[in-house]
Amino acid sequence: MGSKFFVILGSQLFNPKILKKNGCSEVYMAEDFGLCTYFKHHKLKLYLFLTGMREYRDELENESISVNYFELSSRKKGESYVDSLIKFLKKKNLSEINIFEIEDKAFEEEFLKALKAANVTVNIFQSPMFIFERNEFVSMAKGKKVYRMSSFYQKARKNLDILMDENGKPVGGKWSFDEDNRKKIPKNVEPPEMIVFKKSKYAEEIKKLIINNFDDHPGDLENTWFPVNRAGAEKQLDNFLKVRFENFGIYEDAMLEEKNFLFHSCISPFLNIGLLTPDKVIKKTLQYAEKNNVPMNSVEGFVRQIIGWREFIRGIYHEEGALQSKSNYWKHSKKLTSSWYDGTTGIDPLDDCIKTTLKDGYIHHIPRLMVISNIMNLCGVDPKEIYKWFMEMYIDSSDWVMVPNVFGMATYADGGMMSTKPYTCGSNYILKMSNYKKGDWCDTLDGLYWKFTEKNRKFYENNPRLALLTRSLDRLNPERKNHIFKKAEDFIKQNTI
């Protein structure tokens, strides 16, 4: 057993075995008003973090790791996390601490600067939250002016020898089975129910604390659908493998009205706070897939989410996040009205996705990308405003997740640093991938889509992959064009500032 003193953040709830392996015998943990309020985080996100931290305290103590834990009730509202930590270290006469890599760049900078000024030595350990080290991403992306997930993913598969045959070729003959993952869910296919987790002994206390301190944050606390400890997170993964994994691939991009989780694993919240780690998730997934003959499009699609997208996004964030977060390629400047926070915009699928988000603090990637952020972008909303909304509304949100996803993928605000084209769509795509009914909303969304295309005609004409769009725009019936453009203008007036 080592004797190292670790500072553990609320997003670093790693297996105690990892701490012990790194020589940890004692930790500092603190709930913090500043970290709870730097965005108006969804109430369920606060619940996940605060309950998860207290459950983790118990887990560490059961593993004979000494825990110095400060609950919110013992903290002064105006005092920062770092100031409080430095006071504690002085009191304990500690001049050296250990910590896992901090993913949030601004907080990392504040933390290291303050501790240096206080003459505290900080030893930084590689984060188990990711498979690759930060500098590995740099070497894999060396010399590139633009970044592409597909080339990163291929290198990752080769480096890790995952889904590779004996000749060094991808199993199944291709790197991605994404084309097989675009079916809508038929009426006779019922997605399985989510498992119900045992309520945490801290549940009621934390709910009261949130209502008393953060009642103006979005969302409600009714549907605590997720686990808040390691055993529960592992159970969630096991349940996905047993009842959802087989159909995950084929229906990965599908949407259903008033249904949320479908065939998705829903483990991103637990990966993003350390209750699960990607190395173990991949190992368990591949073992299960081999034993149970899971279809290749499901296996590859899930592996791509974990070792492709997730690692790629983190790498982009540390290399280019500072630049991305200042970018605004389309020069959008509009702000969101309250309708985006209560689901009353008047576009049916959008309102359904917002209401689901308020209820669950979660929705899978297609509604996030092709419904919510797509429509925000088509309306000319400032990417910083879109980023803020996503940070506030999801329990799996983090700066490292949302900066590349919003400024890169969702809005193309970075001008194509990590994607070849903006992800925009009209009503056709949404109808094709879902059971949403046709309605008045279709004209509004189509108007937004074609209006955006017309406004950015030069961009589309200069891109060989997209030039076809302007030709389709020019073929629009003038009467229909006027009608849908008017609907779009009315929508923008009513739902943006």
Question: Where is each model-derived feature located?
Answer:
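C-terminal catalytic domain of photolyase/cryptochrome flavoproteins
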Residues: 9, 13, 235, 254, ...
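N-terminal beta-strand-loop-alpha-helix module at the start
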Residues: 1-72
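Short helix/loop capping segments that flank catalytic or ligand/cofactor-binding pockets
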Residues: 15-18, 37-39, 249, 279-281, ...
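Well-ordered alpha-helical segments embedded in enzymatic catalytic cores
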Residues: 52-55, 80-84, 349, 353
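A short acidic (Asp/Glu
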Residues: 16-19, 39-41, 79-82, 107-112, ...
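A eukaryotic "domain-start" boundary segment
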Residues: 155-270, 441-448, 457-497
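Acidic-and-aromatic substrate-binding clefts and catalytic sites of carbohydrate-active enzymes
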Residues: 73-79
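Beta-rich, aromatic/charged-enriched effector core domains that present basic-aromatic interfaces
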Residues: 80-226, 407
